[in-house]
């Protein structure tokens, strides 16, 4: 369903409840969060630093944590996995080597808190933030996730104490057919149609719909949003083989323009959009998802 307000869901992503008390680049002192020592991540992935000189290369960044969960009046459950998506970024947005270095040299803690009855897991990076960085973890120094989205659901009913025992940074290079907005669109203030799959995950930014695709709609102001919402039933989600928590949408070539996208292979028949989601993300399409307008670069503020 298209949103006439355009910004509501996207603003939830820019300013979700867990960050309401903390401005950009304000890192919370570790002693206010946890008594545990910070832990430095290991690294896995298909990182080739030669890619840092290629502006149209995109990578997905994920922290994979192992935590011990201690419930009140219950024994500790050890070795619980947590999936913490940091986002997808191209070299147009920030140099790859600098991003990886900042993530790997940081020290992290993990805590739990409740906001308006909803339980969150907050990951805290100790050190100095990078104000203009596209990844929230590096920009603001902390990132929160709804608890039942990132750890097994059977740990979602009570209050727990977390102890971070292992942390791995996973960097996954997106395939060459990945669509991303072109450089001038990315660093500018142009908004794109997008599909919101979760209020605490970034909207999935889509290419601009071809003009003829929304001529059928009578309201020109809502044309792009209505055009996207009218074809959601045609979109199908596929799990990317051999990638962790990475999914893709192959868009109908006759409905979407790829001219503004960063396509390495210009001969592709249709744009392919990649996004991060939990491994159990449903693959039955995007019906009933909210359509919004979103900036490709989440460091921008909606006006």
UniProtKB/Swiss-Prot annotation:
It is found in: Virion membrane; Host late endosome membrane; Host cell membrane; Host endomembrane system. InterPro entries: EV_matrix, EV_matrix_protein_N, EV_matrix_sf. Disulfide bonds: none annotated. It comes from the Viruses. The keyword Membrane applies. GO terms for biological process: symbiont-mediated suppression of host innate immune response; symbiont-mediated suppression of host JAK-STAT cascade via inhibition of JAK1 activity; symbiont-mediated suppression of host type I interferon-mediated signaling pathway; viral budding from plasma membrane; viral budding via host ESCRT complex. Keywords: Host cell membrane, Host endosome, Host membrane, Host-virus interaction, Inhibition of host innate immune response by virus, Inhibition of host interferon signaling pathway by virus, Inhibition of host JAK1 by virus, Interferon antiviral system evasion, Membrane, Viral budding, Viral budding via the host ESCRT complexes, Viral immunoevasion, Viral matrix protein, Viral release from host cell, Virion. Pfam families: Matrix_Filo. Its main location: virion. The keyword Membrane applies. One of its GO terms (cellular component) is host cell endomembrane system. Late-budding domains (L domains) are short sequence motifs essential for viral particle budding. They recruit proteins of the host ESCRT machinery (Endosomal Sorting Complex Required for Transport) or ESCRT-associated proteins. VP40 contains one L domain: a PPXY motif which potentially interacts with the WW domain 3 of NEDD4 E3 ubiquitin ligase and the three WW domains of SMURF2 E3 ubiquitin ligase. Plays an essential role virus particle assembly and budding. Promotes virus assembly and budding by interacting with host proteins of the multivesicular body pathway. The interaction with host E3 ubiquitin ligase SMURF2 facilitates virus budding. The interaction with the nucleocapsid and the plasma membrane may also facilitate virus budding. Specific interactions with membrane-associated GP and VP24 during the budding process may also occur. May play a role in genome replication. Most abundant protein in the virion. Belongs to the filoviridae matrix protein VP40 family. This is Matrix protein VP40. It comes from Lake Victoria marburgvirus (strain Musoke-80).
